[in-house]
């Protein structure tokens, strides 16, 4: 096969240039539109070394153990933003200890946020009356399952929430949410 001399190589024509420009523009717009869709299906990166996400307060600020313990008494169950942005109860076990697990506040019946009733010492769903004990185990329906659990860890005074993969200590079974 012989090569053409440099002077004989045809340049890019107007039609070819317009096709290339159109293809490049359409490709750029399509990639820009697909980026959020693809990003939606990629799980968020872990914030802590334990593979969890940083717990956030109602203002979206990271929760610190020292700050939380100074404003919440022993036995308190208060909401933070946990995994996937779900409301999660942090449990204060003592004057200087946050519990090693958190309780997801989403009712397993229809998805309402279940408030903690400190007077009755249980979680009571306002939507259809489901009740859960202090550990989130269902004690009265119509909710079919106990509230989901999450691991809670403290690293350098920062509180992290991560996926619960252990056996559910309330039932002795594999967790339904894992």
UniProtKB/Swiss-Prot annotation:
The entry's keywords: 2Fe-2S, Disulfide bond, Electron transport, Iron, Iron-sulfur, Membrane, Metal-binding, Thylakoid, Translocase, Transmembrane, Transmembrane helix, Transport
One matching Pfam family: Rieske
UniProt-annotated binding residues for [2Fe-2S] cluster: 107, 109, 125, 128
Cofactors demanded by this protein: [2Fe-2S] cluster
SUPFAM superfamilies: ISP domain
Intracellular or extracellular location(s): Cellular thylakoid membrane
Domain Rieske, residue spans: 71-161
Bilayer topology term: Single-pass membrane protein
InterPro entries hit by this protein: Cyt_b6_f_Rieske, Rieske_2Fe-2S, Rieske_2Fe-2S_sf, Rieske_Fe-S_prot, Rieske_Fe-S_prot_C
Main location: membrane
GO MF annotations, alphabetized: 2 iron, 2 sulfur cluster binding; electron transporter, transferring electrons within cytochrome b6/f complex of photosystem II activity; metal ion binding; monooxygenase activity; oxidoreductase activity, acting on paired donors, with incorporation or reduction of molecular oxygen; plastoquinol--plastocyanin reductase activity
Gene Ontology CC annotations of this record: plasma membrane-derived thylakoid membrane
EC top class named in words: translocase
GO terms for biological process, alphabetical: photosynthesis
Reaction(s) catalysed by this chain's protein: 2 oxidized [plastocyanin] + a plastoquinol + 2 H(+)(in) = 2 reduced [plastocyanin] + a plastoquinone + 4 H(+)(out)
Enzyme Commission number(s) of this protein: 7.1.1.6
Cofactor note: Binds 1 [2Fe-2S] cluster per subunit.
Family statement: Belongs to the Rieske iron-sulfur protein family.
Quaternary structure annotation from Swiss-Prot or TrEMBL: The 4 large subunits of the cytochrome b6-f complex are cytochrome b6, subunit IV (17 kDa polypeptide, PetD), cytochrome f and the Rieske protein, while the 4 small subunits are PetG, PetL, PetM and PetN. The complex functions as a dimer.
Note: The Rieske iron-sulfur protein is a high potential 2Fe-2S protein.
Function: Component of the cytochrome b6-f complex, which mediates electron transfer between photosystem II (PSII) and photosystem I (PSI), cyclic electron flow around PSI, and state transitions.
Protein known as: Cytochrome b6-f complex iron-sulfur subunit
Organism encoding this protein: Synechococcus sp. (strain WH7803)
